[in-house]
Amino acid sequence: MHRYRSHHCAALRKCDVGTKVRLSGWVHRVRDHGGILFVDLRDHFGITQIVADPASPAFKVIEKVRSEWVIRVDGEVCARSDEVINATLPTGEIEIFVQEVEILSKSEELPLPVFGEPDYPEDIRLKYRFLDLRRETMHKNIMRRTEIIAAMRRAMQNNGFTEFSTPLLTASSPEGARDFLVPSRVHQGKFYALPQAPQQYKQLLMMSGFDRYFQIAPCFRDEDPRADRLPGEFYQLDVEMSFVEQEDVLATMEPIMRSIFEEFANGKTVTQNFPRISYDEAIQKYGSDKPDLRNPIIMEDVSQHFYNSGFKVFAQILADDENAQVWAIPAKTGGSRAFCDRMNVWAQGEGQPGLGYIFWRKEEEKFEGAGPIAKNIGEQRTEALRIQLGLENGDACFFVAGDPKKFASFAGAARTRVGEELDLVDRECFSLAWIVDFPFFEWNEDEKKIDFAHNPFSMPQGGENALECQDPLTLKAFQYDLVCNGYEIASGGIRNHLPEMMLKVFELVGLSKKVVKDRFGALYRAFHYGAPPHGGMAAGIDRIIMLLQGVKNLREVALFPMNQQALDLLMNAPSDVSSTQLRDLGIRMAPTQKNSS
């Protein structure tokens, strides 16, 4: 018999009754029922119940074991009586009557329990991640992560993509966040950077004559903490294709992404044909470029009902600013003063002066609008609003007014809040859509200049002629995002593969030819030697797994994540290094403010 086990802890069934077996694992819990000891023995695969009575030669050893000790047991498979069968366990019809026990390893008092999975402070969980990962939910999350990544690989390979690994020590380049820098010992005073994404490498692969690339790519960004991104390091399904237009990429990746969601949806429905929604439409209808389409609320421009109306606040806003609009946020079933007042309080908590509203009641076959706005704009305008929005008895509507560029984000948050408060959101589906036609440039108010809105390497719609003739702030890019349930899960674009157009694009944001050649020299050089039209995308693996597992925190689906302060509590990183290491790198630490005072 094997030194440690003949079977794993999820393998044995009723057909194995009478078999002599050997199992090894962790003591999940110990129970004493009238002098008979029951031990749940756990390994990676599952749990098997071990039984010892005082007549067992192993009884005295079993009496000593505690939670999370590692033991080896020899015994005989016995059938459980009908009244004690555990239908929730694959091994629930049997138990092992123990004959011999060996203690392989002991555990100190646990800083967090493995059995029962109560809520525990996250910092404790991260510091003792090796214990946290023993818990059933976390163990399943990580195994599901592995399965999803394997499914991604299979899907990509089945669609003619080849997996390449690109370098992790590369040059620093501005891609929207700070780089993690690695000092060079050989070339002192110079630094490598960990890649924020394999963007330039994957484009260079296309220029090297390869056709369809993918990679499960680690990405490193020194960003301030964000709730929807792991600090420091995350993984993406990175993709690039040669000789493609935008629709080619979408048509190729849509069935791949749909198949991943369908395989792991756990009974939830998945969008079959992903709608294409323009960026402008997404902002106007949903107040977000990553809308949650499970929420049926669609916002509408209702400005026409407020021009020269009795509601002077909105009427004055419209009169003073030609860009001003009034947007309506319909709230089916939200027609109570208590709910409307609650939303008003929420809006004030978001830093807004309030949230105007109307709610409708039907009195003797006639709809009546209630609330200050209805009172001020009059019966005729109130009814016209109700008809435009398709609202009925017991429904409500909230309003925001001003320049949409300034209030769209708040309006989107209000739409989300209304949908959640009224339980309008369909929790049993994954609702996916492509967001297309992103603006190429945006105005940087802090620096008073034009800046890239998204990816600087994308092709402008209209090409060189548009760059020459159009107001840059009106230019659209061949860029697209894939969104699901209110999250951006992938982003991509058709690349600019023409060197002169590349220079023109960067010139518009104030970067000279010299700067472009210094920062993107390899890409710029490659463009001069026959660059194919190409495009691709990158999907956030951690975020996709988070959605599929139904958790709210990315750290629940990552193996050894940092906390929100970018600290690795398990490995105590970042940490001090020795003066010898610094000297080898030619680095001297500047005195801190505390030391210099």
UniProtKB/Swiss-Prot annotation:
Spans annotated as Aspartate: 199-202
Enzymatic reactions: tRNA(Asx) + L-aspartate + ATP = L-aspartyl-tRNA(Asx) + AMP + diphosphate
Binding site for L-aspartate: 175, 221, 454, 495
Top-level EC class: ligase
Site entry (Important for tRNA non-discrimination), positions: 33
Localisation: Cytoplasm
Residues involved in ATP binding: 221-223, 488, 540-543
PANTHER family, alphabetized: ASPARTATE--TRNA LIGASE, MITOCHONDRIAL, ASPARTYL/LYSYL-TRNA SYNTHETASE
Name of this protein: Aspartate--tRNA(Asp/Asn) ligase
Lineage, top ranks: Bacteria, Pseudomonadati, Pseudomonadota, Alphaproteobacteria, Hyphomicrobiales
Gene: aspS
